[in-house]
């Protein structure tokens, strides 16, 4: 079955994946990373997209963000891609595409599923062995350090699920640290990544049904083969 067209709905958090062309590195050093977060902040601010979490890996970027109006996420990602590609190509004397086609994304159900997606992003560049040391240097170029109470590279808009972890910043950071230390079950991780790659919403059957009614689009795979004769 062909991949469903990418869906974006204002007001819902989206898990976004940007990958380097042919698996190539999109960051050679921290100068590149700083240039990227600068371009990211500019693009999201211009198009009014709230950023909840981010992780810069060697060949890809994970973002968790919420567009406030329809079409804003797509515009922000296009602007980000063009802006950073120009800087990267100029700095490294290269030409051609930096990214592997269009960005991939999934709409994430609010609640525990959304909090789990945020943990997934923060774990992407976190060394689990160092999380308990409270050393922010062990979590470079991700929002993990901010969710643990340290300064970060990009301003964040915390989701309600993070605020619900405790009454004080210390309580929230402590509760989040526990989650960051826990490994995501392989099946849950696979479901989340598959949802991103196939552009399908990630959540319960009730959530998907609600989105289908809201968007008037089929969001679940149909049965294979021809329809049964009646």
Task: Give short role names for the model-derived ranges.
Residues 1-57, 66-230:
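Short Pro-Cys-Gly-centered "Cys-loop" motif that presents a nucleophilic cysteine in a tight turn
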